[in-house]
Amino acid sequence: MGIGNPYIENGLSLYTAVASTHVIKTTGNKGFIASVIVGTAGVTAPSLTLQNSAGTIFAVIDTSAVRAVELNLKFTDGINAVNAGTTPAKVTITYV
């Protein structure tokens, strides 16, 4: 993935492909990630992790159901959604 503009506007979604890393950057490389909603109903990707650019894992998410994960962390260089699962997963970013 990673084709096109890597910046994601507030409230928009992207789909992470199987065995891929997608770099998500807030506009202007700053802002707090308020929540990340991962998964779609009936879709599983049990190995989806959210990491910073150094590979530090902030969340491991079971996407067997749609759920919100409150991170409340500041990402100055974006966040990586790493999908090591067997199906795509949807990631929705909301930040303030």
Segments from the language model and where they lie:
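Short, surface-exposed beta-strand/strand-loop-strand elements in extracellular ectodomains
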Residues: 42-61, 91-94
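Noncatalytic modules at the cell exterior or secretory-pathway interfaces
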Residues: 34-36, 72-88
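Extracellular carbohydrate recognition and processing domains
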Residues: 15-18, 59-68
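C-terminal interaction-tip segments
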Residues: 1-30, 41, 84-96
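Tight coil/turn sites that cap or link beta-strands
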Residues: 19-21, 64, 76-78
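Exposed aromatic-hydrophobic patches
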Residues: 25-26, 67-74
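Core-facing hydrophobic residues within beta-strands of well-ordered domains
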Residues: 31-33, 45
